[in-house]
């Protein structure tokens, strides 16, 4: 006889464990259990049957894998948590005795330090794994870098997040790894490519943040502890691959003055000593060269001139080989039936030097931090701003002639409303000349900040006149959403997106609406006049009423007349079939009548009949489109009859989604059409 299997020893009851059982098994508190799970990357699971997994009738809410909890039993951090618990008991005992100094000494000298280095190595065995998990880390650290310091968010945490984020930005600037950016309601999205991995993160706008009390900052602080360690490892590895010393030199005084990115100085690993040695050899060689006679120097110059032609040829050959090696690779399919890959149209080096030849000046109202980061990431070396925005600028003088582009984010105002010229900040030779706000310096291009984002997303310099101060900006679209067929594209014109006959139908509908409004207005006037006449008649005929206010039944003659009217109204199906021909004959008659009237008046017929011809063309075009659409629907229905039920259902779903998309696009096009016509008026 087979042994009876005991309940709860296999299946879901064995594979899952509740949170209460896990806390008891690990012998730690619930907050420490949460921190440990966040550090180790263990998350709650959802069993198929909660009652079977809980081994009782009461369904628990949180479950974990039993193997995960068994894995946590060997974690070295458990000992740190237990030491912290024992230390807290000692501190509480000292405070109970009134020994405050002993409690402070215990907390200062015996507090266990948590190190997460081994957890980073366990969770990310390769560097590519760490890069793939960097999106959430960057988003959270940039968020904490812009938060105000409170009791829940200490200043040390904010300073650490700011330092790590600026170090990561410096790597992107040096390597030109930033690819795209997008301004959204939530914040600014960035995308960078590091070692073939696309990393996207969100940076909030620098508004005044109001910290709410419903946010659990203890959980977020745990994630910050883990992500700061992760980003520190990643920055060290990235700097090491470039041969840079990590951490970079940080100027605290400059950072206090608002330098931000300029407060960091990148240094090569053991490069400074070599440069000094080279400089020393240059100095010794320069002193030795003084002793060389002029005759020897003249002979050397002759040799260089004689070999100049061959040298230029060699240089040209080297440049040609370099240009040939720097060409963009073409992805050709291996077989004719293979998929065709998208061909790159621009290289990373070309995109990284997009703003290299320009000198930018950021006005006070423009966001300095994101603009400086993007401009430096795309090759710009000379960026100036007002001294109010902080240190680290190429120039603080707005009248500097080297400035080629100025970023302005204020509306164009008349000269009378502009404020007076502010006083200079310094006196003497180093005084910075102030410019009246709103003035334009000749020889300089003025643009709005959106021009920077649209240029880097397109990979080329766009027309600056479309982004001039006070101009209506083009639509700023996400670079990660590509336009699909049938969807509305705000960058394209209406003529490119409209379907066949859509514009004529819309114009006809607008004319009908305007005619209806005019008819309603005239009918309203007629109704008011009739109401006044009827009121006067009622007042006159009140005494002459014969029926005494009672309804009188109709006679037989009235019934016969009503039947004859009904028969006259229904003309049969032949009349409906011949309605189109009668309409054409009527329109021809009216047109001939208008020609005669125009001839009698001595006017050309084209001016008097332009409106009628346009309406006739529009109505005929609408009829053609409707008939064509009806034929296509009939043909589609015939094709659907030959399909199986499964394919027919799938086709109906596809048609439904396409119809919804086309209806939404039609609504947006009609809205845009009305706005454009309103702007023309």
Curated annotation (Swiss-Prot):
It comes from the Eukaryota. GO terms for cellular component: nucleoplasm; PeBoW complex; preribosome, large subunit precursor. Residues 496-521, 534-546, 554-586 have a biased composition (Acidic residues). Residues 491-527, 574-681 form a coiled coil. Residues 489-681 are annotated as: Disordered. GO terms for molecular function: ribonucleoprotein complex binding; RNA binding. GO terms for biological process: maturation of 5.8S rRNA from tricistronic rRNA transcript (SSU-rRNA, 5.8S rRNA, LSU-rRNA); maturation of LSU-rRNA from tricistronic rRNA transcript (SSU-rRNA, 5.8S rRNA, LSU-rRNA). SUPFAM superfamilies: BRCT domain. Residues 522-533, 587-597, 630-640 have a biased composition (Basic and acidic residues). InterPro entries: BRCT_dom, BRCT_dom_sf, PES. Residues 350-469 form the BRCT domain. Residues 617-629 have a biased composition (Basic residues). PANTHER family: PESCADILLO - RELATED, PESCADILLO HOMOLOG. HAMAP family: Pescadillo (MF_03028). Component of the NOP7 complex, which is required for maturation of the 25S and 5.8S ribosomal RNAs and formation of the 60S ribosome. Component of the NOP7 complex, composed of erb1, nop7 and ytm1. The complex is held together by erb1, which interacts with nop7 via its N-terminal domain and with ytm1 via a high-affinity interaction between the seven-bladed beta-propeller domains of the 2 proteins. The NOP7 complex associates with the 66S pre-ribosome. This is Pescadillo homolog. The lineage of its organism: Eukaryota, Fungi, Dikarya, Ascomycota, Pezizomycotina. The gene is nop7.
């Amino acid at each position: 006889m087979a042994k009876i299997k005991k309940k709860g020893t296999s299946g879901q009851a064995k594979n899952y464990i509740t949170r209460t059982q896990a806390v008891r098994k690990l012998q730690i508190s619930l907050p420490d259990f949460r921190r440990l799970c966040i550090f180790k990357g263990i998350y709650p699971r959802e069993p198929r049957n909660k009652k079977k997994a809980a081994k009782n009738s009461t369904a628990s809410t949180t479950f974990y894998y039993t193997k995960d909890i068994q894995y946590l039993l060997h974690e070295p951090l458990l000992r740190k948590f237990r030491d912290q618990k024992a230390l807290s008991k000692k501190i509480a005992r000292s405070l109970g005795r009134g020994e405050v100094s002993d409690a402070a000494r215990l907390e200062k000298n015996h507090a266990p330090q948590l190190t997460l280095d081994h957890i980073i190595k366990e969770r990310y065995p390769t560097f590519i794994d760490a890069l793939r998990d960097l999106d959430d880390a960057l988003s959270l650290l940039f968020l904490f870098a812009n938060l105000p310091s409170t009791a829940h968010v200490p200043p040390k945490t904010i300073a650490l997040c700011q330092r790590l984020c600026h170090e990561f930005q410096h790597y992107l600037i040096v390597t030109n790894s930033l690819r795209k950016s997008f301004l959204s309601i939530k914040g600014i999205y960035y995308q960078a490519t590091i070692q073939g991995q696309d990393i996207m993160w969100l940076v909030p706008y620098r508004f005044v943040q109001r910290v709410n009390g419903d946010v659990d900052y203890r959980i977020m602080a745990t994630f910050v502890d883990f992500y700061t360690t992760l980003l520190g490892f990643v920055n060290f590895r990235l700097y090491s691959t470039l041969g840079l010393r990590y951490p970079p030199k940080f100027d605290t005084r400059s950072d206090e003055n608002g330098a931000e990115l300029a407060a960091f100085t990148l240094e090569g690993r053991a490069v400074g000593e070599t440069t000094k040695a080279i400089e020393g050899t240059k100095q010794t060689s320069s002193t030795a060269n003084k002793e060389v006679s002029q005759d020897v120097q003249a002979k050397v110059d002759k040799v260089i001139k004689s070999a100049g032609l061959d040298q230029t040829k060699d240089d040209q050959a080297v440049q040609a080989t370099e240009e040939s090696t720097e060409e963009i690779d073409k992805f050709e399919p291996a077989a004719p039936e293979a998929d065709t890959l998208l061909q790159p149209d621009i290289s990373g080096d070309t995109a990284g030097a997009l703003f290299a030849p320009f000198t930018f000046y950021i006005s006070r109202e423009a966001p300095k931090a994101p603009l400086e980061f993007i401009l430096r990431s795309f090759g710009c070396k000379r960026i100036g701003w007002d001294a109010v925005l902080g240190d680290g600028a190429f120039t603080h003088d707005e009248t500097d002639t080297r400035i080629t582009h100025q970023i302005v984010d204020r509306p164009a105002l008349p000269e009378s409303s502009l404020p007076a010229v502010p006083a200079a900040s310094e006196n003497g030779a180093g005084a910075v000349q102030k410019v009246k706000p709103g003035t334009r310096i000749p020889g300089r291009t003025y643009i709005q900040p959106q021009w920077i984002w649209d240029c880097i997303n397109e990979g080329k310099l766009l027309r600056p006149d479309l982004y001039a101060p006070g101009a209506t900006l083009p639509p700023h679209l996400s670079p990660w959403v590509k336009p699909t067929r049938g969807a509305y594209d705000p960058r394209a014109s209406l003529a490119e997106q409209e379907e066949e006959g859509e514009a004529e139908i819309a114009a006809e509908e607008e004319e009908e609406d305007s005619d209806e409004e005019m008819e309603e207005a005239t009918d309203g006037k007629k109704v008011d006049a009739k109401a006044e006449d009827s009121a006067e008649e009622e007042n006159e005929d009140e005494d002459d009423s014969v029926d005494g206010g009672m309804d009188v039944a109709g006679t037989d003659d009235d019934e016969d007349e009503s039947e004859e009217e009904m028969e006259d109204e229904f003309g049969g199906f032949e009349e409906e079939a011949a309605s189109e021909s009668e309409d054409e004959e009527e329109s021809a008659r009216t047109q001939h009548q208008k020609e005669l009237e125009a001839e009698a008046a001595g006017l050309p017929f084209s001016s008097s009949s332009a409106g009628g011809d346009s309406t006739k063309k529009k109505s005929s075009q609408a009829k053609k489109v409707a008939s064509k659409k009806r034929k296509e629907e009939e043909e589609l229905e015939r094709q659907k009859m030959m399909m199986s039920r499964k394919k027919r259902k799938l086709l109906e779903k596809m048609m439904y989604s396409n119809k919804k998309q086309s209806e939404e696009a039609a609504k947006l096009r009609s809205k845009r059409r009305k706005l454009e016509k309103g702007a023309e008026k």
